[in-house]
Swiss-Prot record:
SUPFAM superfamilies xref list: Protein kinase-like (PK-like) (SSF56112), SH2 domain (SSF55550), SH3-domain (SSF50044)
Keyword vocabulary terms for this entry: ATP-binding, Cytoplasm, Kinase, Nucleotide-binding, Nucleus, Phosphoprotein, SH2 domain, SH3 domain, Transferase, Tumor suppressor, Tyrosine-protein kinase
A GO MF term: signaling receptor binding
Protein name as it appears in the record: Tyrosine-protein kinase FRK
Tissues expressed in: Predominantly expressed in epithelial derived cell lines and tissues, especially normal liver, kidney, breast and colon.
Catalytic site: 354 (proton acceptor)
Tagged with keyword Zinc: no
């Protein structure tokens, strides 16, 4: 009878975390209140941590890359309730259960949990990540193919060059580079080529380091639905810059989490208008968009709390010593990243209205993200150098499409026009477009089909993309998805791959 009871308990224990025998007196529990989870939607799902995470609140669970976790509740998209399945490697005590950011874990034994699998990243992004100095020859990753849905590509670091191979797939199952050697799984594929190069440029070494850590979708589980937060929880540490709407600060939330804080000038927006727009903005989630975390709107100055990008705006970055030394490869890459974020907004039928280098932010490891999307609709602006009065509103005339200037009607195609001006800012290292011209003169010249001339250092191929964005007919301008792949494939003909049979074209 005792054996039957023991087996029954072993079966039920994972589903009854509140009664777990692991929560005994010998374990230091940082947050006893977090031991009892909400009603679980699915049980028994085991996950692997992809990145380190340090708890931000008493309800959170700290973990390290490689830790095994059991997810007990997935009620909220961005934050799951989970428990540790193993003791910490250094022997220290730890909280047993708590909330975790869902984009930091992958289901155990899944392809996404493999350290060498990078998901749906483009070829140029794969090259950039493999070329980080921490990676050595033989470092590799497998990614979803850009051109062939459901298929995969292998990217390998060979000295100072990244080589790419298409992993072919049989209809009946199996993966191969050449038909003389077929593998039933990608794990077998990787295992084989880590033992021998067998036709590859080099033998596979260690997986590419995952240096780019995603931002959690919210500050914490508590701010998922209640994102009007106490301003006393925010410390303003260092002013990063100032603009027409207020100041941007590096801040600290809850004494744990670095954030960016935009403090708005009193009267710069109507709080109710902003909250309506922000509710939409908070649900827009993409790696190339700045994540809106929380707001403080009950008194002036209004705070907008977002993820922190330590290098400031792209405009300032291009004009400083570091940005002025970048070359065409990096310029095309930053343009492609912005196009990727804008393609997501395009897919969600959302319009930016103020796309410019000043509204793109620069992070670590050459990461660029679109900021302030949608805010132009609610800001009351007074910077006459950028925003000029048209039809009783103020517009950034030098970045605004002619049809939007005429009628004050914005569309994703007017954003495409602005993207063309952004390309001009990128290639000229942050120069003011239409330098020396007033807004009124720009409007007059555009009516005569004038376009910004090709900068002296601008390749014809790059300038052609700009001209496409400035098509007088909005419907004839490219989509952001088209702009994304054009920029990601910009150097396609300049490849340095040695194996023409396996090189991805």
């Amino acid at each position: 009878m005792s054996n039957i009871c023991q087996r029954l308990w072993e079966y039920l224990e994972p589903y009854l975390p509140c009664l777990s025998t692991e929560a005994d007196k010998s374990t230091v529990i940082e947050n006893p209140g977090a031991l009892c989870s909400p009603q679980s939607q699915r049980h028994g799902h085991y996950f692997v941590a992809l990145f380190d995470y340090q708890a931000r609140t008493a309800e959170d669970l700290s973990f390290r890359a490689g830790d095994k976790l059991q997810v007990l509740d997935t009620l909220h998209e961005g934050w799951w309730f989970a428990r540790h399945l193993e003791k910490r490697r250094d022997g220290s005590s730890q909280q047993l259960q708590g909330y975790i950011p869902s984009n930091y874990v992958a289901e155990d034994r899944s392809l996404q949990a493999e350290p060498w699998f990078f998901g749906a990243i483009g070829r140029s992004d794969a090259e950039k990540q493999l070329l980080y100095s921490e990676n050595k020859t033989g470092s590799f990753l497998i990614r979803e193919s850009e051109s062939q849905k459901g298929e995969f590509s292998l990217s390998v670091l060979d000295g100072a060059v990244v080589k790419h191979y298409r992993i072919k797939r049989l209809d009946e199952g199996g993966f191969f580079l050449t038909r003389r050697r077929i593998f039933s799984t990608l794990n077998e594929f990787v295992s084989h080529y880590t033992k021998t190069s067998d036709g590859l440029c080099v033998k596979l070494g260690k997986p590419c380091l995952k240096i780019q850590v995603p931002a959690p979708f919210d500050l914490s589980y508590k701010t998922v639905d209640q994102w009007e937060i106490d301003r006393n929880s925010i410390q303003l540490l260092k002013r990063l810059g100032s603009g027409q709407f207020g100041e941007v600060w590096e801040g600290l939330w809850n004494n744990t989490t670095p954030v960016a804080v935009k403090t708005l000038k009193p009267g710069s927006m109507d709080p109710n208008d902003f909250l309506r727009e922000a509710q939409i903005m908070k649900n827009l989630r993409h790696p190339k968009l700045i994540q809106l975390y929380a707001v403080c709107t009950l008194e002036d100055p209004i705070y907008i709390i977002t993820e922190l990008m330590r290098h400031g705006s792209l405009q300032e970055y291009l004009q400083n010593d570091t940005g002025s030394k970048i070359h065409l490869t990096q310029q095309v890459d930053m343009a492609a990243q912005v196009a990727s974020g804008m393609a997501y907004l395009e897919s969600r039928n959302y319009i930016h209205r103020d796309l410019a280098a000043r509204n793109v932010l620069v992070g670590e490891h050459n990461i660029y993200k679109v900021a302030d999307f949608g805010l132009a609709r609610v800001f009351k602006v007074d910077n006459e150098d950028i925003y000029e009065s048209r039809h009783e509103i103020k517009l950034p005339v030098k970045w605004t499409a002619p049809e939007a200037i005429r009628s004050n009607k914005f569309s994703i195609k007017s954003d495409v026009w602005s993207f063309g001006i952004l390309l001009y800012e990128i290639i000229t290292y942050g120069k003011m477009p239409y330098s020396g011209m007033t807004g009124a003169q720009v409007i007059q010249m555009l009516a005569q089909n004038y376009r910004l001339p090709q900068p002296s250092n601008c390749p014809q191929q790059f300038y052609n993309i700009m001209l496409e964005c400035w098509n007088a007919e909005p419907k004839e301008r490219p989509t952001f998805e088209t702009l994304r792949w054009k920029l990601e494939d910009y150097f396609e003909t300049d490849s340095s791959y040695s194996d023409a049979n396996n090189f991805i074209r």
